[in-house]
Amino acid sequence: VRLARELAAAKTAAVYGRIGVNTVEFGTTCAWLIEAINVLTGNIDKRGGSMFTTPATGGATTRGQGGKGKGFAMGRGHSRVSKRAEVLGEYPVAALAEEIITPGENQIRGLVTVAGNPVLSTPHSKQLDAALAELEFMVSIDIYVNETTRHADVILPAPSSLEKDHYDVGLYLYAVRNVANYSEPVLKRDPSTPDEADILLKMAGIFQGLGADCDP
């Protein structure tokens, strides 16, 4: 109670939380409550409080009329097995293993991973590790063989981070300061090595039945 009163009375204050409160049973509620507290205490988007970032590009604050948002839809569908609600067109990764191992219509039988290791980074990791072994086919775009990619039928190596230019569109959405840094490649890339975008475009064409010789 004392902490709540001090927070409400403080001239400047901010409540902040990310992965620790978001990867639990009521993670969405926790994330919403954090922002609700900042709003109710008058600490939203003001100096000393919880401010909106305005990155150079890639976010809701970089386009459209300032101060107005259109919101987003959620709950338009549910996962097949445990009926977990959709949010922003995605389902919780906690449902992935059960969607692979549970027979029935629309059962997941194939998987593509890109530079990730969900066997270590997601809930029900042991169950997911076992489930990946049951897939009919799995492709990983990665430069490492790790706990996840070891299950892949094919590993397609993309250029390393030192061989690519870089502008961090995603993380600047959470930046403490509004910055824009662009990095040129450190190493010269082999021209015969396709970029991740080229690999994904080629795979998309193959998945659409255009064949392995399709031109992305």
Name every feature range the model reports, one short phrase each.
Residues 51:
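Active-site-adjacent alpha/beta core region of enzyme catalytic domains
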Residues 1-36, 40-46, 54-216:
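Non-catalytic alpha/beta scaffold blocks inside enzyme catalytic domains
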